[in-house]
């Protein structure tokens, strides 16, 4: 991830940043409401129930920026109950919480059976819906925003909310990015388990979508495949971030722009037998914050 490294080397990386939690299995909903309302989790849930009213009252991040004189932009994942088109001045390609369900991408690979899935075949839709990978669409939108913001540079500063859906499942990336990570070079986590413990106590059943990414019991091979696709979609997203950073530099606005990078939660990706985010292990609650 050379472009994340660019951000770290030119800024500050908070290595102990955590998501406060969630009121449902869709952890991203809670974290994005916390982010956009500035509320702790116990207040963010209340605000989520009346999000449009909160926006109308000016109590959304984007509304505060508008009041401060910023021209506001948004693209990508929203997953907040207030209308993005009303929250921001310019909106392009708002996406839902995740790509459409792609059943072939789950409960795989099965041992001794052909894998029905290809993370780089556009026929499966998902991140490829529309013919262009969603991460590339988001990056292109960000470049459009920079060009538009340049026109207003002397009148208004800009605020851009650029929300990649990656690395949400189904994890898809171009073939060249998959090939960067040969399976024989991928390590299985030291905490690998064929079955995650306390599934009933933590209310994390096998039927949970996140945990259906690989079959039960887990095999080392299936975890390697899962991690290969995770690494690929992350590296592909990093490339798109690089395009945005290059565009910012070319715009001449780099030195007067603050770039913040974070995520809504972590992921298990094979640690402790888990693949998803609905648990309290470090790997699922800690987030990057640069």
Regions found by a protein language model. Give the residues of each.
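Formylglycine-dependent sulfatase
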Residues: 1-290
């Amino acid at each position: 991830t050379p472009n994340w490294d660019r951000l770290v080397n030119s800024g500050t990386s908070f290595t102990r940043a955590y998501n406060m939690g969630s009121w449902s299995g869709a952890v991203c909903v809670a974290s994005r409401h916390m982010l956009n309302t500035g509320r702790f989790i116990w207040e963010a849930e209340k605000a989520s129930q009346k999000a449009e009213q909160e926006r109308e009252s000016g109590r959304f991040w984007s509304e505060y920026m508008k009041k401060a004189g910023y021209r506001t932009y948004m693209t990508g994942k929203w997953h907040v109950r207030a209308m993005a088109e009303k929250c921001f001045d310019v909106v392009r390609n708002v996406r839902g919480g995740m790509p459409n369900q792609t059943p072939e991408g789950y409960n795989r690979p099965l041992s001794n059976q052909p894998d029905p899935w290809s993370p780089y075949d556009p026929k499966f839709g998902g991140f490829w819906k529309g013919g262009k990978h969603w991460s590339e669409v988001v990056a292109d939108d960000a470049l459009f925003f920079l060009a538009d913001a340049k026109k207003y540079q002397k009148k208004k500063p800009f605020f851009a909310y650029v929300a990649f859906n990656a690395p949400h499942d189904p994890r898809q990336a171009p073939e060249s990015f998959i090939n960067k990570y040969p399976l024989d070079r991928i390590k299985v986590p030291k905490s690998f388990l064929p079955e995650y413990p306390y599934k009933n106590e933590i209310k994390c059943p096998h039927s949970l979508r996140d945990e259906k990414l690989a079959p039960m019991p887990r095999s080392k091979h299936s975890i390697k495949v899962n991690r290969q696709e995770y690494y690929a979609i992350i590296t592909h997203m990093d490339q798109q971030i690089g395009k945005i950073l290059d565009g910012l530099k070319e715009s001449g606005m780099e030195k007067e722009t603050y770039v913040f990078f974070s995520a809504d939660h972590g992921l298990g990706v094979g640690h402790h037998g888990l693949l998803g985010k609905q648990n309290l292990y470090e790997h699922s609650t800690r987030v990057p914050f640069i």
